[in-house]
């Protein structure tokens, strides 16, 4: 039994060991994922490859080997990550997990009610189609009080491209407040009125935690430090990484290392979503793929990355109209809907005969130029 436990522990993810955050990030950045990969590594070799002192390397190896030989291993982070549960409990979680609405009912409908908690959702699309706009919209909407159908949470916004616009967030938050005020006037309930007292512009902005990451090392460091941040901010129900591809496409030429780092990052995001009962949003760029003498736009980072997120949405254009295609979902069928971005944020649009809403044809649309007035 002890031998089986040891073999199991050697497959354990390095981020689950009680290592310092700085060492943990350096190990992952160097491409190490599991304890097994460090089994035959000497302290001097680890020091050189990871960029830490020999004393730190020796201490790291000792901690990992000691943990692997312990009959009752300890896991970093929340104890819920390894708690047993039944299929019935999982079903009940699915029914009560909650959703973050987008204010576009067509988009909410194809997602099953909105962006779901406890799942990772990837939003792909060409520049200017609305990925960052949706991220900012969700950072506001996640804070909607429960009596209005929201989840009353907070948001973490990790920005890799510098696309976050606080003035735009002010517009979205102001529109959201006005919308809820209209609902409260209709209901005339004390609960709604009291909830709006705290749902102010200042409170909304103060509960969006913004982090700017300029390269993949900073991004990995921030993501792997999130468990500590979330333990201090237990109301966070949304983590956004706006521009997951940007740092990896421009700063990393080693494709093998890039794949390992991305896989580790994806697993960390899944763990955060499950352990902290929050939604994860990842935005991705599109790249051109030549297939049978035809140029198609496909999500960046390759096919293996396509399995990382639970849900994949693709935003694209049909003439001057924006469309969203639910390309991948474990519970909803593939579907394409129209949406528009108004000064107030994401909203529904009227289907016209000129727009076919055909998924296959729409997704093969190349990048198009946009009129200046289309930009918000």
From Swiss-Prot:
Tissue specificity remark: Expressed in a variety of tissues, with highest expression in testis, heart muscle, spleen and prostate.
Localization per Swiss-Prot or TrEMBL: Nucleus; Cytoplasm; Cytoplasm, Perinuclear region; Mitochondrion
Induction: Stress-induced increase in the mitochondrial levels is seen.
Effect on the protein upon substituting residue 131 to R: Partial loss of function
Result, substituting residue 131 to A: Significant loss of function; abolishes Holliday junction resolution activity
Region of interest: Interaction with RAD51B, RAD51D and XRCC3: 79-136
Binding-site list for ATP: 125-132
Phosphoprotein keyword on record: yes
GO biological process, any: reciprocal meiotic recombination
Name of one Pfam family that matches: Rad51
Effect on the protein upon substituting residue 138 to F: In BROVCA3; reduces interaction with BRCA2 and to a lesser extent with PALB2 and RAD51
Region ranges (Required for Holliday junction resolution activity): 1-126
Main localisation: nucleus
One GO cellular component term noted in the UniProt record for this chain: nucleus
Keyword terms of this UniProt record: ATP-binding, Cytoplasm, Disease variant, DNA damage, DNA recombination, DNA repair, DNA-binding, Fanconi anemia, Mitochondrion, Nucleotide-binding, Nucleus, Phosphoprotein
SUPFAM superfamilies in the record: P-loop containing nucleoside triphosphate hydrolases
MF-aspect GO terms: ATP binding; ATP-dependent DNA damage sensor activity; crossover junction DNA endonuclease activity; DNA binding
Lineage top rank: taxon: Eukaryota
Function as written in the Swiss-Prot or TrEMBL entry: Essential for the homologous recombination (HR) pathway of DNA repair. Involved in the homologous recombination repair (HRR) pathway of double-stranded DNA breaks arising during DNA replication or induced by DNA-damaging agents. Part of the RAD51 paralog protein complexes BCDX2 and CX3 which act at different stages of the BRCA1-BRCA2-dependent HR pathway.
Family note: Belongs to the RecA family. RAD51 subfamily.
Disease connection: Fanconi anemia complementation group O: A disorder affecting all bone marrow elements and resulting in anemia, leukopenia and thrombopenia. It is associated with cardiac, renal and limb malformations, dermal pigmentary changes, and a predisposition to the development of malignancies. At the cellular level it is associated with hypersensitivity to DNA-damaging agents, chromosomal instability (increased chromosome breakage) and defective DNA repair.
Complexes and interactors: Part of the RAD51 paralog protein complexes BCDX2 and CX3; the complexes have a ring-like structure arranged into a flat disc around a central channel. The BCDX2 complex consits of RAD51B, RAD51C, RAD51D and XRCC2; the CX3 complex consists of RAD51C and XRCC3. The BCDX2 subcomplex RAD51B:RAD51C interacts with RAD51. Interacts with SWSAP1; involved in homologous recombination repair. Interacts directly with PALB2 which may serve as a scaffold for a HR complex containing PALB2, BRCA2, RAD51C, RAD51 and XRCC3. Interacts with HELQ. Interacts with DNA damage up-regulated protein DDUP.
Name of the protein in its database record: DNA repair protein RAD51 homolog 3
Source organism: Homo sapiens (Human)
């Amino acid at each position: 039994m002890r031998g089986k436990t040891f073999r199991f522990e050697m497959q354990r993810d390095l981020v689950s060991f009680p290592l310092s955050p700085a060492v943990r990030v350096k190990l992952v950045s160097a491409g190490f994922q599991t304890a097994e990969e460090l089994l035959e590594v000497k302290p001097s070799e680890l020091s050189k490859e990871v960029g830490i002192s020999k004393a730190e390397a020796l201490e790291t190896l000792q901690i990992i080997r000691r943990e692997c030989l312990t009959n009752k291993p300890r896991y970093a982070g929340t104890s819920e990550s390894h708690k047993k549960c039944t299929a019935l409990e999982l079903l009940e979680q699915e029914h009560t997990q909650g959703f973050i609405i987008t204010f576009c009912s067509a988009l909410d409908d194809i997602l099953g009610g909105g962006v779901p908690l406890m799942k990772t959702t990837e939003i792909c699309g060409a520049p200017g189609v609305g990925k960052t706009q949706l991220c900012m919209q969700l950072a506001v909407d996640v804070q909607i009080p429960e009596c209005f159908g929201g989840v009353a949470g907070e948001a973490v916004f990790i920005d890799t491209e510098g696309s976050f616009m606080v003035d735009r967030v002010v517009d979205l938050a102001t529109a959201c407040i006005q919308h809820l005020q209209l609902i409260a006037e209709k209901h005339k309930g004390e609960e709604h009125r009291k909830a709006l007292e705290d749902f102010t512009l200042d409170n909304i902005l103060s509960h969006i935690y913004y982090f700017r990451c300029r390269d993949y090392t900073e991004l990995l460091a921030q993501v792997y430090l999130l468990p500590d941040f979330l333990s201090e901010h237990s109301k966070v129900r949304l983590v956004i990484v706006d521009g997951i591809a940007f740092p990896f496409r421009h700063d990393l030429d080693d494709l093998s290392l890039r794949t390992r780092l991305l896989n580790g990052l994806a697993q960390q995001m899944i763990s955060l979503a499950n352990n902290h009962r929050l939604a994860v949003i990842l935005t991705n760029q599109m790249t051109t793929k030549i297939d049978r003498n035809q140029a198609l736009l496909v999500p960046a980072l390759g096919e293996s990355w396509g399995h990382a997120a639970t849900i994949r949405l693709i935003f694209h254009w049909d003439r001057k109209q924006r469309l969203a295609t639910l390309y991948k979902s474990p519970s909803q069928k593939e579907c394409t809907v129209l949406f528009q971005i108004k000064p107030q944020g994401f909203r529904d649009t009227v289907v016209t005969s000129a727009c076919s809403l055909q998924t296959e044809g729409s997704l093969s649309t190349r990048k198009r130029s946009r009129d200046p007035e289309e930009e918000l």
